[in-house]
Curated annotation (Swiss-Prot):
Modified residues (Phosphoserine): 1218, 1222
Protein name according to UniProt: E3 ubiquitin-protein ligase UBR2
Subcellular location: Cytoplasm
Chain intervals for the UniProt region annotation (Disordered): 1203-1227
Lineage: Eukaryota, Fungi, Dikarya, Ascomycota, Saccharomycotina
Cross-referenced PANTHER family: E3 UBIQUITIN-PROTEIN LIGASE UBR1, UBIQUITIN LIGASE E3 ALPHA-RELATED
Length: 1872
C-alpha cells in the first residue's frame, strides 16, 4: 500500500487509484472524500496538497468501521462548498444569456414585435409583460419532449439587440461584455477540469469499446454454433469467459490500471438498467425470486431501488464468473435485459456520475459559476489527452484509431471522394481570447490531418476535443440523471455570448454526422435525439452560426449522409460499417427503414430560415446540386395504379415514411428558394431565378418523359423541332370543335404519382422571384425580370402544369370514389396531400402551376388538355356517356371538374402576394374565416378543422382574435365561443379549397340565409356572390387568368353541360355551372359576352331555340326544379344590365328564345307569389309534420330537464331557478308540494303515477366530510382564520399566486360520516323488486368490479344513471306541523294505526339497508331510528358545510344554493325519521334518555362533552311533536344552545392552553384587535366565561398570567361566536326541514359595517327566529347561572376524580375531538398557472421521471400516477395507495390533479376515472394534454364547483361508475 501512496501525486492518480483504495465499494463517504478532494484541488495545485493524508483516510480503521458514514448521515454536504453567499432572486443569468431549458407543460412567450421569427422563445421566468405593453405577444406551452430554450439575453434573436435585455430580473439586463480575459486566469481550475474531463472520457470510451468487443464476441459465438447441445454449452461457456477474464482490451491501460485488473479476486455482478427494463416490476420481482431463490422482499427491494433511482441496480455479486454468467442467461431466457459487469467497472460508472454531479454544481451552484463556465469552456474546447497509452497521440503513435472519432459515423469514404476534403479548417477571426485561438489553431491542424487520402481504411478518423468526445461517447454511458445534468452543463457553455461560442458550434458541426449516426443506430433511450434537438436550438438558430454552415460544406454532406442512412435499419448500423457513403442521393426502393434521420432535415430547415447571407447560399454550387438532387429523388416514388376488378387484398401503408420525410424536404427546399426574396442585387437575383427555372423545367420534362407512356402509338405524333417536346408522346384530341395535341396520358388508367417535386420547385421559384421576405420588393427590383419573355413558348408553358393537373384530377377522382377498390391507403394519401401541413407546398403548388399555364399558354389548348385529363371528352362534345362506367360517376366527376375550375379562377392568394409575410397572413386569414364562417365555434372546433401547421404556429391566437370576436363561457360547463367579425363575412367562399363537400353545402346555405335576412328577401331569390379578383390580378403575371373564358372551347363546354343538365335533370350540377358563369361575367365581362350570347351548333332539335349560354340560363328560370339557382341567374342578368348597359339582354333573349317574357326575368311581387299549388301544398304539409315532431321532442326534453336539472351556473352569480328546482323555505307552501315539485312524478319502470302503490326514491349512501377542525399549532391556519374575522380575506381566498407561503391544505381534523344523496327518481316497490330479480341472474354471471359492500343491491337509476345502494320511501305525512304550531305548543298526538303497516315494513327495510351499509345491525325499532337520525344529521351537517361558501347577507342559510336533489333528500330522510318515531309513541325511552343525558347538567358535564347535540336536537323535535317534553319547545332549543356553548368553551380552552396562547411565537401569529376601542358587554361576559374554563386545564401549582390571554381577546370571542353560529345554523336548517315555515322570522334591524356586528347579527337572527332572548342575554345568563354551577361541579371534591378523568380524556384525544373550524370547506390552494407545478419541481427529476405527477387536492401530497407501489405488491398505484393509506384527510374519495395532462383523477373504491380539471385556457377550453398548446389558468368557479358539488356533494361515485361501466346506459330524455 505504501507504493500506492507514493504513486499518487496529482488528482488524476487519485481518481485512477480510487477504485482500489475504496475496494470497489462506492458509498456516501467515498463520494464525500471525492468532493472534498476536488474542492481542495480547486483552490490549490497538485503540489500543495498532501495526498498521503487523503489516502490514509481510506486506510483508516474509522473508514473500515463506517464511522464516517454515521457522521454524514442526513447532512446536505454536497452544497456546502458551492453555496452562494446570497440567495438569488428569481432567474439569475447575469453576464450570460438565459438559455434555460423549458420542458413540456411549461409556459413560454413569443413577442412578434421584438422578434419576427417564431424560433425565439422567452421563458416565463424572464418574460416581463410590463416591458411588452402594446406588443403583439402570445403565451404557449412547450409541447415537444426535448423542450425549448429561452433566448432572453441573446441579441441575435431580436430585431433590435437592446430588446434582448428586457428580463423580469433587472440584474440580468446588463449588456454582456466580451472582455473575458480576466475570468480565465485561474490555472488551478482549468487544469483540474482538464484532469476530470479526461478521466471521464477515458472511462466512457474504454467502457464503450469493451462493451462492443464483448457484444461482438457473443454474437460471433452464437452464429458459429447455432445448434449446440448441453455438453457443447459447457465448453463454449469456458471459451466465452476467457476473453472476459483475460481481457486484451486492457493492454492499453497504464500500470496502475493494469494492476487493478490483475488482482487475485475479481468481483462480478449482474445489473439491470432502468431504461432497458421492458417488463412490469411485479413480473420482474417474481422472476428474480424464482431464479435467485430468494424471498420476495429482496426482489421488491431491487425493483423499488430500480424505480426510485432511475439508474442501474446490482441484483447479484460474486467472484464466480461462471455462476454469474449462468444466472444472467436465465434472466435473458425470461426476456429480461441484464448485464454482467466487473465490480471495478461498476465503481467507475458511479464515479463518473458523481464527477458529472460535481461539474453540474460547479456550473450552476457555485458563487463563481460564471468564471467556472469560462474555464469549463476552455477545457471542453481543448484536445482530449488520454491517460491510456494506446489512446494517446504521440510521435510514435500518430494514428490511434481505437480512440478516434469517425466523422462520417460508421461509413467509409468512397474511392471517388477519397481525394476530396470533406471537413475544412475554420477561420474564426474575431476570437479575442488568445488561449482559445491557440486551441483553434491546433484543432484545425488535426482536422487537416484527419483527411488521409492514402489510408487503407478510408475511415475519416479525427482526434477530437473533450466536448466532441463527451457528446459522442459519454452521454450514453452516464445514468439517466447524469445525462441530463451533462446536457445542462453543455447548454451552459452556449450561454456565454462571445465569439468563442462559434468555435464550440463549429466543433459540434464537425461531429454532427457521427452524432446523427449514433442517434439512429443505438438510441433506444432517445438520449441522442434529445441532445441533437437541444444543440440544434443552441447552434443553428443563431444566424451567425447558420451562416458558418453554408461555406463549411455541412449542408451538402448532411443531406448526402442522410440519404445513405435511410436505407439501414437501426440495428444494422455498427460503429465501423464496411460500407462506403453513397456517391449521390438515392432513396430506398421499398421503404425508408428508419425515421430518426428526420432530425437532420429539421436542422437544415432551421439553417435555411435563420441564415442572413442568401447570396452566398444560392451561389454555392454544391448546396444547389444537393438540394436539387435530393428533392428530385422523390419524383417517381409510390406509383399509383387504379384497381378496376377487385379490392386490394392487403392495404400497404409503407408510403407514410416517404410522406414523413418529404414534408421536411419540402420545407427545406422552400426555405432554400425563399432566400431569393432576400436578394437585393437585381442581376444576381435574375441569374439565380433563371438558373432554377431552367433546372426545374428540364427535370420536370424528364420526369414527364419517364412517367407518360403512349396508349395508342398509332395516334401519337411528335414534333422534332423542340427537344423538350420531341421526347414526349402526344396524341391529337378534338374537344369542343378544337383540335390540339396533348400528352398521351389518362388519369385513372395509366400509372401516376402524387409527388411531383420539380413542379413544386417551379412554383417556389416563380412565387419567391416576385416577393420580398417581410415587405414587398423595392422599386429597383420591380421589373428585374420579364417572365413573359422567359415563357414565350406557349407549349412549354402548358406542359409545365401537366403533372400538377393530373394530380388535381386524381384527387377529384378519389373524392368521388372512382378509386374505391384501392382501399384506405389511397384516400389517406389524398388526405395527407390536401389536408395536412404538406398542403401549402404540394396541393397549393399544383393549383398555382395550372393557374400559371392558364395565364401563359393558349387557352384553347389548355381547355382541351384540361378536359382530356378529366376524361370528359364525350361529355364536352355533347354525348353524356362513354367517359366513365356509369352515369352517377360521370356526373360526380363533372361536378369536381367544374369545382376545380371555380377554384382555379378564385384561389389567388399565391398569385397576388407581395411578400412572404403577406402570403403568410393571407393564409391565416382564409383558414380562420372559413373555419368559422357563420357558426359559433369553440377554440377546439376551430383548431380541429384547420391544418396543424397553422394552428401550431405561435401567432395563430393573435390572428384568431383579429378576425373573430370572443365570448367568455356563460356557465361552468360551457366553452368560450368565437364568432367571425361582420366585416369579414363577405369574404366567405363556399368553394374554398379547404372545405369538405358537406361543409361547402352548409356554408352556401348560410350565405344565402344571411343575405335573405340582411336584404329582406326570399331564400329563393338569394345567391352566392361571385368573388371579384380582376383588380387584384391587374399588373401581375396572372392578369390573363380568365383568358380561357374568352374562347369558344370553354363556351361550348359550358353550353353542352347546360344541355345535359336540362335534358337529364342534373339539378345538383346547375349551381356550380351558374356560379362559374357568374365568375366569368364579373371578372371578364367584355370578352365573355361573346361566349355568353354565342349561338353554338344545335345538337338536339328539341332544344333548337335555346342554343346560347344566356338563353339556356333563361330557360332554367322556367323550370321549378331549378329554383335553387333562379336567384343566381337573375343576379347575372341584373349585373349585365347594370354594369354593361351596352349589352341589350332583352334583345338577345327575344332573339334566342321562343317566347321571352320579361316578367320571368324581372318578376313582380305578384309573379313571385304564383307557384305550383300542389307543390306548395306538399311543402306545407311537410313543414307541419316536421313542426309537430319537433314540438313533441321539445316537450319531452323540457320535461326531462325540469325533473332532473342540476344547477351548473357560475357560482359567483346568484342562482335564479324556479321554485320546482330550489324552493325557498320562507315562502314554501308545504312539504308535500315541495317534494312533488322537486322530483319525477312517475315510476321509472312502469311510468305510472307514484300514488298507485308504495313509492320509494333511489338514494346512495357514502361517507363524506361533515366537519373539519382547526390546527392551533399551525400559525398559517390561525392567521387565516383571524383575517376572516377582521375582514381582510378575499372571497376567493382559495386561489393565490404564490401558495408556497401556505402549507397547501386547509382541511384538518376532518370528520367523515355517512351521507345520503337522492337523485330525484323512484319507483313502486313492486316494480323495483321485479327489476332486481331480473338483473340478479345477470350479475351472478358477470365479473363487474363492484365493491363487496354493495353486494347485488347496486343498481343504476334508469333515468339519470345515478348509482343507488339504498332507497327512501315517500311516506306522505299529512300531519306534518308548521313552525307556528311548534312555537304555539299545539300538540298533535297520533296513535299507532293499523293501516300504516305496509309502509312500516318498507321504512324498516330502508333503515336496515342504511344500517348495513354502515356496518350496523338494526334489530329493534330504536336501532332503526338512531341509524336514520344519524344519517339525517350527517346530511344536514354536510349541507351546511357546503353552504358556507355561499353566505348571503341578511339570510341565515342561503337556501337558493341548495340543489333540488339535496332538498328532496333531506325531506325524505326527515319524514322517514319521523315516521319510525311514531312506531313507539308510547315508549318513554327517548324522552327519558334526553332528560338523563342532556337536561341533567351533572350527567352532561361528565358524559355529554363529546356527544353530537344535533342528534338530540333532532330527537327532541320528535319528542315535542309527540308531546313527550314538559318544557316549552323554544326553551329546549335555548338550553341546547347553552350545552353546545359549554362544549365549545371546553374545546377552545384546551387548545389554547396547548399553545400557551401564542406567548412564545408572536412573530408567527399576527393576531390583533379588530378595532373596537371599548369592548361590548357581550364580549366581556364571553371573555370572562372563557377565563374560568381555562382554569380547568391549568395545573394547580402553576400561576397563570392572563395578560397574554388579554392580547388575543377579540380573536377568542370572535371564534367562539362564529363556532356557536355554526351549531345555530345547522339547527335552523334542521328545523326548516322538519317544519314548514309559514312566517317570516327575519326582522330587519339596522346593519352595521363592523364585521363582528354582522356575525352577531346572524346569531341574533337565529335567536329571534326561535323566539329566544338576544345574544347578550344568553351570554349573561350563561355567565351568572351555568358558569358558576359548572365550575363548582367540576371542582367539587366528591366528583373530582371523575372530572379529572374527563379533562384527561379530552387532552388525550386532541386530534379526534378538534375545535370546529368556521371556515368554508375547500380543497388545497392552487397556483394561478398550471405550469407553476413544473417550475416548482426539480428540473432534473422533472425530466427523468417517466410518471406524471398528480397532486392530491385534499392534502397537497404529490404522487406519481400509474406508478405501482412496491410495498403493496405492485397491485395498486401511488394515487390509490395514498387515498387509502397515506392521505391525512379521511375521505372515501381520492381527488388528484394531473399536472402534466391537466385533468382530474377521481378515485373511488377500486375504480377511478378522469374528470375535467378546473384549469382552462384563456378561451375557456380544458385543453387536456395541452393538445392546443395554450397555457391554462385556474377558473375559480369551476374549482369551487368541483369542491362543493362533486367532492363534498357525493357525486364522485356516480361519475366514476358512469364512466367506467361499459354496459351502463347513460340514459337521457329521449329514452323516456
Amino acid at each position: 500500500m505504501e507504493d500506492s501512496d507514493l504513486s499518487i501525486t496529482n488528482i488524476r492518480d487519485f481518481l485512477t487509484e480510487l477504485p482500489k483504495l475504496a475496494k470497489c465499494e462506492y458509498s456516501e463517504t467515498t463520494s464525500y472524500l471525492l468532493w472534498k478532494t476536488l474542492n481542495l484541488r480547486l483552490k490549490h495545485s497538485d503540489n500543495d496538497i498532501n495526498w498521503r493524508s487523503l489516502v490514509s483516510i481510506l486506510n483508516s480503521e474509522a473508514w473500515e468501521n463506517e464511522k464516517y458514514r454515521d457522521i454524514l448521515n442526513g447532512r446536505k454536504w454536497r452544497t456546502l462548498e458551492f453555496e452562494n453567499d446570497h440567495h438569488s432572486v428569481g432567474n439569475m443569468h447575469i453576464g450570460t444569456a438565459c438559455t434555460r431549458l423549458c420542458f413540456p407543460s411549461e409556459t413560454i412567450y413569443y413577442c412578434f414585435t421584438c422578434s419576427t421569427n417564431p424560433l425565439y422563445e422567452i421563458c416565463e421566468l424572464c418574460f416581463d409583460k410590463e416591458k411588452h405593453v402594446n406588443h403583439s405577444y402570445v403565451a404557449k406551452v412547450v409541447m415537444r419532449p426535448e423542450g425549448r430554450i429561452c433566448h432572453c439575453g441573446d441579441p441575435f434573436a431580436f430585431n433590435d439587440p437592446s430588446d434582448a435585455f428586457k428580463c423580469k430580473n433587472e440584474l440580468n439586463n446588463i449588456p454582456i461584455s466580451n472582455d473575458n480575459s480576466n475570468v480565465t486566469d485561474d490555472e488551478n481550475v482549468i487544469s483540474l477540469l482538464n484532469y476530470v474531463l479526461d478521466f471521464l472520457i477515458d472511462v466512457t470510451v474504454s467502457y464503450k469499446e469493451e462493451a462492443e468487443a464483448h457484444s461482438s464476441e457473443r454474437k460471433a459465438s452464437s452464429l458459429m454454433h447455432p445448434n449446440q447441445n448441453s455438453i457443447t454449452d459447457d465448453i463454449m461457456e469456458k471459451h466465452e469467459c476467457e476473453p472476459l477474464v483475460n481481457d486484451e482490451n486492457f493492454v492499453f491501460f497504464d500500470n496502475n490500471w493494469s494492476n487493478t485488473r490483475k488482482e487475485a479476486h475479481m468481483e462480478w455482478a449482474i445489473q439491470i438498467e432502468e431504461e432497458e427494463c421492458n417488463v412490469h416490476y411485479m413480473d420482474l420481482a417474481s422472476t428474480i425470486t424464482r431464479i435467485l431463490n430468494t424471498p420476495v422482499e429482496y426482489a421488491i427491494s431491487i425493483t423499488k431501488a430500480l424505480e426510485d433511482s432511475h439508474d442501474v441496480v446490482t441484483v447479484l455479486q460474486s467472484e464466480n464468473f461462471f455462476e454469474i454468467d449462468q444466472i444472467a442467461k436465465e434472466f435473458q431466457k425470461e426476456n429480461i435485459v441484464v448485464h454482467v459487469r466487473k465490480a471495478d467497472d461498476i465503481f467507475k460508472r458511479k464515479l463518473t456520475d458523481d464527477l458529472t454531479d460535481w461539474l453540474y454544481s460547479l456550473c450552476f451552484k457555485a458563487a463563481t459559476s460564471l468564471q467556472n463556465k469560462y474555464a469549463l469552456r476552455i477545457s471542453m474546447l481543448d484536445v482530449w489527452y488520454s491517460h491510456f497509452s494506446k489512446m494517446r497521440v504521440s510521435p510514435t503513435n500518430t494514428n490511434p484509431d481505437f480512440s478516434k472519432i469517425n466523422l462520417l459515423g460508421g461509413f467509409l469514404i468512397s474511392n471517388e471522394d477519397s481525394d476530396e476534403s470533406w471537413f475544412k479548417p475554420w477561420s474564426l477571426e474575431n476570437i479575442e481570447d488568445e488561449r482559445i485561438s491557440k486551441i483553434l489553431t491546433n484543432y484545425n491542424e488535426r482536422l487537416i490531418r484527419a483527411h488521409s487520402p492514402n489510408t487503407v481504411s478510408h475511415f475519416y478518423n479525427f482526434y477530437g476535443s473533450r466536448f466532441q468526445y463527451i457528446i459522442i461517447n459519454s452521454i450514453n454511458i452516464l445514468s439517466k440523471k447524469s445525462k441530463f445534468k451533462m446536457l445542462k452543463i453543455m447548454a451552459s457553455l452556449f450561454s456565454l455570448r462571445d465569439e468563442s461560442r462559434k468555435f464550440l458550434a463549429a466543433q459540434y458541426i464537425d461531429v454532427y454526422l457521427s452524432v446523427l449516426y449514433d442517434a439512429v443506430a443505438s438510441d433506444a433511450k432517445e438520449c441522442q435525439v434529445t441532445l441533437m434537438s437541444i444543440l440544434g436550438q443552441y447552434t443553428f438558430q443563431d444566424p451567425s452560426i447558420a451562416n458558418m454552415t453554408i461555406s463549411s460544406g455541412f449542408i451538402e454532406r448532411t443531406i448526402r449522409f442522410a440519404f445513405t442512412l435511410m436505407a439501414f435499419n437501426p440495428e444494422d448500423l455498427m460503429s465501423y460499417l464496411p460500407i462506403s457513403l453513397y456517391n449521390g442521393f438515392k432513396l430506398p426502393t421499398e421503404t425508408i427503414r428508419n425515421r430518426r434521420t428526420i432530425i437532420c432535415f429539421k436542422d437544415l430547415c432551421t439553417i435555411m430560415s435563420a441564415n442572413t447571407v442568401p447570396e452566398e447560399l444560392l451561389s454555392n454550387e454544391a448546396i444547389f446540386n444537393a438540394i436539387i438532387e435530393s428533392f428530385s429523388e422523390f419524383s417517381n416514388v409510390l406509383p399509383l395504379k387504379r384497381e378496376t376488378k377487385e379490392h386490394v387484398e392487403v392495404e400497404n401503408f409503407d408510403f407514410s415514411a416517404f410522406y414523413f420525410f418529404f414534408s421536411s424536404i419540402l420545407i427545406m427546399t422552400d426555405g432554400y428558394t425563399r432566400s431569393i426574396s432576400l436578394v437585393k442585387d437585381a442581376a444576381f437575383r435574375k441569374q439565380i431565378v433563371l438558373k432554377l427555372l431552367d433546372v426545374a423545367q428540364t427535370r420536370e420534362f424528364e420526369s414527364l418523359t419517364n412517367s407518360r407512356k403512349a396508349i395508342s402509338p398509332d395516334n401519337a405524333s411528335t414534333n422534332e423541332n423542340d427537344s423538350n417536346k420531341a421526347t414526349l408522346s402526344t396524341v391529337r384530341e378534338t374537344i369542343c370543335n378544337y383540335v390540339a395535341e396533348t400528352i398521351n396520358f389518362q388519369v385513372g388508367v395509366n400509372t401516376q404519382y402524387f409527388f411531383n417535386p420539380m413542379s413544386y420547385l417551379f412554383k417556389f421559384v416563380i412565387q419567391w422571384s416576385q416577393c420580398g421576405r417581410y415587405e414587398p420588393i423595392p422599386a429597383s427590383l420591380t421589373n428585374y425580370i420579364n417572365l413573359f419573355e422567359v415563357f414565350q413558348d406557349k407549349q412549354k408553358a402548358l406542359y409545365i402544369s401537366e403533372s400538377a393537373l393530373s394530380t388535381l384530377v386524381l384527387i377529384g377522382q378519389i373524392n368521388v370514389g372512382f378509386w374505391v377498390r384501392n382501399g384506405t391507403p389511397i384516400t389517406h394519401q389524398a388526405r395527407m396531400y390536401t389536408k395536412y401541413s404538406m398542403r401549402e407546398f404540394t396541393y397549393i403548388s399544383d393549383i398555382f402551376n395550372v393557374q400559371f399555364s392558364m395565364a401563359m399558354c393558349n387557352p384553347d389548348e389548355l381547355m382541351v388538355t384540361y378536359l382530356s385529363r378529366w376524361g370528359l371528352k364525350h361529355w364536352a362534345n355533347g354525348v353524356p356517356m362513354y367517359d366513365y362506367p356509369d352515369t352517377e360517376t360521370t356526373v360526380a366527376v363533372v361536378n369536381e371538374c367544374i369545382l376545380l375550375l371555380i377554384q382555379l379562377l378564385t384561389e389567388v392568394r399565391s398569385l397576388v402576394m407581395k411578400s412572404s409575410k403577406e402570403g403568410f397572413e393571407r393564409t391565416f386569414k382564409s383558414e380562420i374565416i372559413h373555419a368559422l364562417c357563420f357558426d359559433t365555434c369553440s377554440y377546439a372546433q376551430i383548431v380541429n378543422c384547420i391544418p396543424e401547421h397553422i394552428t401550431k404556429h405561435p401567432s395563430f391566437d393573435i390572428y384568431l382574435e383579429k378576425y373573430a370576436n370572443y365570448t367568455s363561457p356563460v356557465s361552468l360547463t360551457d366553452n368560450g365561443i368565437f364568432v367571425l367579425k361582420e366585416k369579414y363575412k363577405d369574404e366567405i367562399d363556399p368553394y374554398y379549397i379547404g372545405l369538405s363537400s358537406s361543409r361547402r353545402y352548409d356554408v352556401e346555405k348560410n350565405i344565402r340565409l344571411n343575405m335573405a335576412n340582411l336584404k329582406k328577401m326570399k331564400y329563393e331569390d338569394t345567391f352566392v356572390p361571385a368573388k371579384k379578383v380582376k383588380d387584384l390580378l391587374k399588373n401581375t403575371l396572372f392578369s390573363g387568368l380568365y383568358s380561357i373564358s374568352s374562347v369558344n372551347t370553354f363556351g361550348l363546354f359550358l353550353k353542352n353541360t347546360l344541355d345535359h343538365i336540362i335534358k337529364y335533370d342534373y339539378d345538383n350540377l346547375l349551381p356550380r355551372v351558374v356560379h362559374l358563369i357568374h365568375l366569368c361575367v364579373v371578372n371578364n365581362l367584355n370578352e365573355f359576352m361573346g361566349i355568353l350570347w354565342h349561338e353554338y351548333a344545335i345538337v338536339d332539335t328539341e332544344f333548337c331555340h335555346y342554343h346560347s349560354i344566356g338563353s339556356i340560363l333563361y330557360y332554367c328560370l322556367l323550370k321549378d326544379n331549378f329554383s335553387e339557382s333562379h336567384g343566381k341567374i337573375r343576379e347575372i342578368f341584373r349585373y349585365l344590365m347594370e354594369t354593361a348597359p351596352h349589352v341589350n339582354v332583352n334583345s338577345y333573349l327575344r332573339e334566342q328564345t321562343t317566347s321571352y317574357t320579361p316578367g320571368i326575368l324581372w318578376p313582380t311581387k305578384e309573379d313571385k307569389s304564383h307557384k305550383d299549388k300542389e307543390f306548395e301544398r306538399k311543402k306545407h304539409l311537410a313543414r307541419l309534420r316536421k313542426k309537430k315532431l319537433m314540438k313533441k321532442l321539445a316537450q319531452q326534453q323540457m320535461k326531462f330537464m325540469e325533473n332532473n336539472s342540476v344547477d351548473t351556473s357560475d357560482i359567483s352569480t346568484p342562482r335564479t331557478t324556479s321554485p320546482s328546482l330550489s324552493p325557498t323555505r320562507i315562502n314554501a307552501e308545504n312539504s308535500s308540494n315541495t317534494i312533488n315539485s322537486c322530483c319525477d312524478d312517475d315510476c321509472v319502470f312502469c311510468k305510472m303515477p307514484k300514488d298507485d302503490d308504495v313509492f320509494v326514491y333511489f338514494s346512495y349512501q357514502e361517507r363524506n366530510i361533515c366537519d373539519h377542525g382547526i390546527d392551533f399549532t399551525n400559525p398559517t391556519d390561525v392567521n387565516r382564520i383571524n383575517s376572516l374575522f377582521s375582514g381582510k380575506q378575499t372571497k376567493d381566498s382559495a386561489i393565490q399566486e404564490n401558495p408556497q407561503d401556505d402549507d397547501g391544505t386547509r382541511l384538518k381534523f376532518t370528520s367523515c360520516e355517512p351521507v345520503l344523496r337522492a337523485c330525484g327518481h323512484g319507483s313502486h316497490t313492486k316494480c323495483l323488486s321485479g327489476h332486481m330479480k331480473s338483473i340478479r341472474g345477470i350479475q351472478n354471471q358477470t365479473t363487474k368490479n363492484i365493491p363487496l359492500s354493495y353486494g347485488s343491491g347496486l343498481i343504476y337509476c334508469p333515468v339519470c344513471n345515478s348509482l343507488s345502494n339504498s332507497f327512501l320511501p315517500k311516506t306522505n305525512d299529512i300531519d306534518k306541523r308548521t313552525s307556528s304550531q311548534f312555537f304555539m305548543c299545539i300538540e298533535k298526538r297520533s296513535e299507532a294505526e293499523e293501516n300504516l303497516d305496509p309502509m312500516s315494513s318498507i321504512c324498516i327495510k330502508a333503515a336496515m339497508i342504511l344500517g348495513d351499509l354502515q356496518g350496523k345491525k338494526v334489530t329493534t325499532i330504536e336501532d332503526a331510528y338512531k341509524v336514520v337520525n344519524s344519517v339525517f344529521i350527517n346530511t344536514i351537517s354536510n349541507t351546511e358545510l357546503r353552504l358556507r361558501s355561499h353566505k348571503k347577507e341578511g339570510k341565515i342559510v342561503n337556501m337558493e344554493r341548495i340543489s333540488s336533489q339535496c332538498i328532496l333528500t333531506l325531506h325524505l330522510v326527515c319524514e322517514l325519521k319521523s315516521f319510525i318515531y311514531k312506531k313507539f309513541v308510547n315508549s318513554k325511552t327517548f324522552s327519558s334518555e334526553i332528560s338523563r343525558k342532556i337536561w341533567n347538567w351533572n350527567e352532561f358535564l361528565i358524559k355529554g362533552n363529546n356527544v353530537n347535540l344535533l342528534l338530540y336536537m333532532s330527537q327532541n323535535f320528535d319528542n315535542i311533536d309527540g308531546g313527550k317534553t314538559p318544557q316549552p319547545p323554544n326553551l329546549c332549543i335555548y338550553e341546547m344552545f347553552k350545552r353546545r356553548f359549554h362544549q365549545l368553551l371546553l374545546l377552545l380552552a384546551r387548545d389554547m392552553m396547548r399553545v400557551n396562547f401564542y406567548k412564545d411565537c408572536r412573530n408567527k401569529i399576527k393576531i390583533s384587535s379588530n378595532g373596537s376601542e371599548e369592548p361590548s358587554t357581550s364580549f366581556s361576559y364571553l371573555f370572562n366565561t372563557f377565563k374560568k374554563y381555562v382554569d380547568l386545564f391549568k395545573p394547580d401549582d402553576v400561576r397563570f398570567d392572563f395578560t397574554s390571554l388579554e392580547k388575543i381577546k377579540d380573536f377568542i370571542c370572535s371564534l367562539l361566536l362564529e363556532s356557536l353560529s355554526i351549531f345555530c345554523r345547522r339547527t335552523f336548517l334542521l328545523f326548516n326541514i322538519q317544519y314548514d315555515d309559514d312566517g317570516d322570522g327575519d326582522n330587519n334591524n339596522n346593519r352595521s359595517n363592523n364585521f363582528m356586528d354582522v356575525k352577531q347579527r346572524e346569531i341574533e337572527l337565529i335567536f329571534r327566529y326561535f323566539k329566544l332572548p338576544n345574544l347578550t342575554h344568553f351570554l349573561k345568563d350563561f355567565f351568572y347561572n351555568e358558569l358558576t354551577q359548572n365550575i363548582e361541579r367540576y371542582n367539587d371534591g366528591n366528583d373530582n376524580l371523575r372530572i379529572q378523568q374527563v379533562i384527561y380524556d379530552m387532552v388525550q384525544n386532541i386530534n379526534t375531538r378538534a375545535y370546529p373550524s368556521p371556515e368554508h370547506i375547500q380543497l388545497i390552494e392552487l397556483p394561478l398557472n398550471l405550469s407553476k407545478f413544473s417550475l416548482d419541481n426539480d428540473e432534473i427529476s422533472n425530466k427523468c421521471d417517466k410518471y406524471e405527477i398528480a397532486v392530491c387536492l385534499l392534502c397537497g401530497q404529490k404522487c406519481h400516477i400509474q406508478k405501482s407501489i412496491a410495498l403493496q405488491g405492485y397491485l395498486q398505484g401511488e394515487c390509490t395507495d395514498h387515498m387509502r393509506n397515506g392521505c391525512e384527510i379521511t375521505s372515501a374519495y381520492g381527488v388528484f390533479l394531473m399536472t402534466g395532462t391537466n385533468a382530474i383523477y377521481l378515485s373511488y373504491g377500486k375504480r377511478g376515472t378522469f374528470y375535467a380539471a378546473p384549469y382552462l385556457s384563456k378561451y375557456g377550453e380544458t385543453n387536456e394534454d395541452y393538445k392546443f398548446g395554450t397555457p391554462v389558468y385556474l377558473n375559480r368557479a369551476r374549482y369551487a364547483n368541483l369542491a362543493n358539488e362533486i367532492v363534498f356533494g357525493n357525486m364522485i361515485p356516480h361519475i366514476v361508475f358512469r364512466l367506467t361501466d361499459g354496459s351502463a346506459d347513460l340514459g337521457g330524455w329521449e329514452t323516456m
